[in-house]
Amino acid sequence: MSAEARKTETIPEWKQEEIDELVAFLERYESVGVVDITGIPSRQLQDMRRDLHGTAALRVSRNTLMERALNEGGDGLGELVEHVEGQVGLIGTNDNPFGLYQQLEESKTPAPINAGEVAPNDIVIPEGDTGVDPGPFVGDLQQVGANARIEGGSIKVVEDSTVLSAGEEVSSDLSNVLSELGIEPKEVGLDLRGVSSEGVLFSPEELDIDVESYRTDIESAASAARNLSVNAEYPTARTAPSMLAKAAGEAKSVGLSAAVESPDLADDLVSKADAQVRALAAQIDDEEALPEELQDVEQPAAADSAAEADDEDDTGNVEQTDESDADDADDADDADDADEEDGDGGDALGDMFG
């Protein structure tokens, strides 16, 4: 008989049943952690169990039995054994480890601190009226290091007073003063020591992240990757629609610049031509320079956009277009002078633009 078998036989039946129940508990959840329950009163612990109901479950047992269950659980749960020390419990959830950590941190509540406990952070008595009538309490405040005095029939703390630094032990006098003032300097809750999910062990430090900042970083990275894919003309399922739209826009711009006759470009070409006619007429010092059929017609809104699109995609031809327009304007002036001599300038312009 193997040593393991003999060892199993020596375990009392009730212990083996407890281990089996713990193993079954571990197998029900995707994420399993070890939490510190030191100093939590039984009533508050029950309240925490109730608050966790529906999202997580807490199981407390003997440390030796929890260690055995973790070693038998597999999937990397054995790595949690090193955290089973002191007053601890097992917590299971189907949420991810980050969600579990956030839930436990948000569930913590303020609590008074007792004499002999170590301050988790600096303890500060804030400036203000204590609401306590004049009496020996002012001396108690001063004794623990608070700057207090009697003013207006009440005991007041005249400035924020740090009465104990983090890591120092709380004295009986300070505990009584804090209790009298209703100051609760510590938080009571389940402290996560470690959590295992899909064979990966996470420490509390790794789980303590700013979710919103992390989400913003991910969104920025995804946006940058998408832009890089589009600009590098690397098609993917996400970038293909944008690349097709970009290609269609560029093809349309080329068609407008080259005046390619196409049903898809007809409206834009007409608007572009209208804009050019109006621009040319505006340079001629003659109210009748614009053909009569266009004088009472408002310029189409699409004309501006078509002209702008043409300018953006064909900047190399801007100077040539300006020179051409100027030459056309000079020709129009010469024609205007000749028509004035003949007395039929309007008909000549009509022939020019008709």
From Swiss-Prot:
Compositional bias (Acidic residues): 286-296, 307-345
An example molecular function term from Gene Ontology annotations: structural constituent of ribosome
One CC-aspect GO term: cytosolic large ribosomal subunit
Entry-linked InterPro entries: Ribosomal_protein_uL10, Ribosomal_uL10, Ribosomal_uL10-like_insert, Ribosomal_uL10-like_insert_sf, Ribosomal_uL10-like_sf, Ribosomal_uL10_arc
SUPFAM superfamilies: Ribosomal protein L10-like
Region of interest (Disordered), ranges: 286-354
Key words, A-Z: Ribonucleoprotein, Ribosomal protein, RNA-binding, rRNA-binding
Gene3D superfamilies registered for this protein in UniProt: 3.30.70.1730, 3.90.105.20, 6.10.140.760
GO biological process: cytoplasmic translation; ribosomal large subunit assembly
NCBIfam families membership: PRK04019.1-4 (NF003097), PRK04019.1-5 (NF003098)
Family designation: Belongs to the universal ribosomal protein uL10 family.
Protein role: Forms part of the ribosomal stalk, playing a central role in the interaction of the ribosome with GTP-bound translation factors.
HAMAP family: Ribosomal_uL10_arch (MF_00280)
Quaternary structure and partners: Part of the 50S ribosomal subunit. Forms part of the ribosomal stalk which helps the ribosome interact with GTP-bound translation factors. Forms a heptameric L10(L12)2(L12)2(L12)2 complex, where L10 forms an elongated spine to which the L12 dimers bind in a sequential fashion.
Protein name as it appears in the record: Large ribosomal subunit protein uL10
Organism: Natronomonas pharaonis (strain ATCC 35678 / DSM 2160 / CIP 103997 / JCM 8858 / NBRC 14720 / NCIMB 2260 / Gabara) (Halobacterium pharaonis)
Gene it is expressed from: rpl10
